[in-house]
Amino acid sequence: MIRIKRVYEKPSPDDGIRVLVERLWPRGVSKEKAAVDRWCKEIAPSPELRKWYSHDVSKWEEFKQRYLKELDGNQLVERLSALAARGDVTLIIAARDPERSSAAVLLGLLEHREGA
């Protein structure tokens, strides 16, 4: 199972492997508190895309399409997919709105691959 959790939420044994999917380390969070097993910053949206989106809800649909294009061919997608096939994976993010975050797009892609 793959899920999303904010880095500010308490880690849980149910999280399985915790993978930070942010390009920048979250402000004010120590490595101990984040308790991430892996940091895949190269799977996060490009700085240009992140800046363009700026969590503007009106740009959400276009952001998803642009980010999916960036993910196309990214080998980390395959690695995360393989990791999830072996057990629980939690995508860790700092974004305030997990449902409209890059992790939500990534989760959708990974779930689609699982079902394919």
Functional labels for PLM-detected ranges:
Residues 1-116:
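Residues lining hydrophobic/aromatic ligand-binding pockets adjacent to catalytic sites
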